[in-house]
Amino acid sequence: MDKLAKPTNRALFLVSVAVTGALAGAAVWLFFFVMEHGIDYLWTEIPHALGVASPELASGPFGFLPYPFFVCLLGGLLIGLYEKMTGTKTDDLNQVMAKVKQDGRYPYDNLGKLSLAALLPLLFGGSIGPEAGLTGVIAGLCSWVGDRMRRFGAEFRELTLLGTQAALTALFTAPVFGFVAPLAGSADGQGEGADDESASGEITIKLPKAQKTVVYGIAIAGGLGTYLLLGQLVGGGMGMPRFESAEVGNLELTWLIPLALVGTACGWLYFVSEHASEALSHAIGERPVVKAMLAGLALAICGTVLPYTMFAGETQADVLMETYLTIPAGVLIATGLVKAMLTPALINMGWRGGHFFPVIFSGVSLGYGLAILTGADPVFCVAVCTASTMGAVMRQPVMVVGLLLMCFPLKGIVCMIIAAVIAAGIPLPKPLRK
């Protein structure tokens, strides 16, 4: 950080950093709070009331048999019409990171429209994560603040990067990932300019000087602290699942590589669906309503047969920890595989959002299913399957470790690193590369 002209400006900058981090954390909490209450009303209270009114239809995973079709098709209609009427499209997380790293700022002229565009697919049950649209909104807000305070010093322009770090930290409750991703300019090492070969190559992360690291740490602490504090005081908020201790014995070590290969295959299915849905989207052309309603229909079908394929997956992961033994192994495995394919299809067909939370849940569901089949420790299986699925999709073990570091106990982390390296080290088949 260049030395500020006056000590007063330096102090003002540090205060602004802490406030920016706190505001980013508060914005993440508020978004999740609205989303959780909206989902609860739309997917719990209304179908329950309909089931009471029509007992003959009071069945299915949501208490009213045809309900997913009503809501998902309505959601597709609204999402498509909103895009058609406003022209608003949320950037994915890599696009946000690339703009912040390259320009040091993010556009803030349509933040209200972007917020609604990010929220709609989540409310209607989309198997997408909130991280993409929400991070763009927070980066825009931080750019707006930085532009108005830059007269106090050029360093205030860095508030966009600092706010983005704080937002990612609060989103994933993962300080390491929140610190590294904006510096890399990519959430998974596959930025806009990544080609077929570099997609699986090493990313370059220029670590800041010690003074900058302290400043970044203040922003990250402010964001995560505010997010956790609001969650404790008011409730709400999401975050990565936290798993208990893992037992790693001879049986688990025997299954390490096979489980990692299954997770890798699950990650490859993500790319199969991504390529197929991109081709379908291009074939349909500029018809956002048609594409979004087709995506809604696919979501409704999957959600009726496999309910856990819906939604981002962070809440469902906590539920699976307690209930996975009551679900057949085949259903858990199918859920993981189908969800990995459903997420990119929804994104390419207009239900825009992130893919991190859903892909993580795919690995969790897959791991629990394979734990039932193999008899191996469930947390071990979840750690290996989640890390390998994410490694296959992200192609960067460093990013996988940073994202999942706080999810697993020490023994699970070691296995997670090995699985991520295996999955990322196996080259993607050429037809699946961009």
PLM feature segments, named:
Residues M1-K434:
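Alpha-helical transmembrane segments and immediately membrane-proximal extracytoplasmic
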